[in-house]
């Protein structure tokens, strides 16, 4: 993605607004979970569409503590393990309970994101969902990649506070190099203003 064409990142208040907005809609739990998979786990549209319950569930049939994204579900060899954010995990538990009511549900085969017409949605359908949501809420310049960029930017800003490095952010993002990860990270004007007085 060229630098001038990158999707915008979301502020905390925008994330909160989208989260609340989606929950108020007809397929609120599913839609909010799709959004959280982007903004709290950094998944691409393709990865959200290809995410199966088997990548999230423990052998006991419960939602685990991480997403075990396979290479087949990802872009190239971008399979990885992503620890689950608390809010996202709670949503997945509720979504799993609803999915298990469907007589066609099978933990190894069923996809997390389904529509009324299909048991497996396409990456383009996920892209279209995000476009519709952002248009409905009035967020210009945002796309299905905005949540992923927000996740990567926030992780990069906070990773050192938990003893990690940009290499950990790279691994969470599933990037082949640090250079790719760095292109995703938004700068912070306030931080740049403050740092010159600290050094």
Name each region found by the language model.
Residues 36, 40, 150-175, 183:
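C-terminal catalytic core of tyrosine-transesterase DNA break-rejoin enzymes
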Residues 73-93, 108-131:
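C-terminal catalytic core of Y-nucleophile DNA break-rejoin enzymes
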Residues 12-41:
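Basic, Lys/Arg- and aromatic-enriched nucleic-acid-binding interface segment
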Residues 34, 46-51, 169:
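Alpha-helix N-cap/helix-start motif at helix boundaries, enriched for small hydrophobics
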Residues 26-29, 79, 119-125, 140-146:
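N-terminal core-binding DNA-recognition domain of tyrosine site-specific recombinases/integrases
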Residues 50-88:
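Conserved tyrosine-mediated DNA breakage-rejoining catalytic core shared by Y-recombinases
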Residues 1-16, 77-85:
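DNA breakage-rejoining catalytic core of tyrosine-based enzymes
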Residues 73, 173-198:
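Catalytic-site neighborhood detector that most strongly recognizes the C-terminal catalytic loop/helix
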């Amino acid at each position: 993605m060229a630098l001038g064409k990158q999707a915008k990142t979301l502020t905390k208040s925008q994330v909160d607004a989208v989260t609340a907005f989606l929950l108020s809609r007809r397929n609120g739990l599913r839609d909010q979970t799709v959004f959280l998979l982007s903004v709290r786990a950094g998944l691409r549209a393709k990865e959200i569409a290809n995410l199966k319950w088997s990548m999230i569930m423990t052998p006991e049939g419960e939602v685990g503590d991480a997403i075990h994204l396979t290479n087949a579900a990802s872009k190239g060899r971008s399979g990885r393990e992503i620890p689950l954010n608390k809010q996202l995990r709670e949503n997945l538990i509720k979504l799993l309970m609803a999915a298990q009511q469907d007589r066609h549900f099978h933990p190894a085969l069923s996809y997390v994101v389904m529509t009324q017409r299909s048991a497996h949605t396409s990456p383009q359908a996920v892209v279209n969902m995000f476009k519709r949501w952002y248009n409905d809420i009035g967020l210009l310049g945002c796309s299905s990649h905005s949540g992923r960029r927000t996740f990567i930017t926030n992780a990069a800003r906070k990773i050192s506070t938990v003893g990690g490095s940009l290499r950990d952010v790279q691994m969470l993002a599933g990037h082949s190099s640090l250079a790719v990860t760095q292109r995703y990270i938004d700068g912070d004007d306030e931080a740049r203003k403050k740092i010159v007085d600290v050094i």
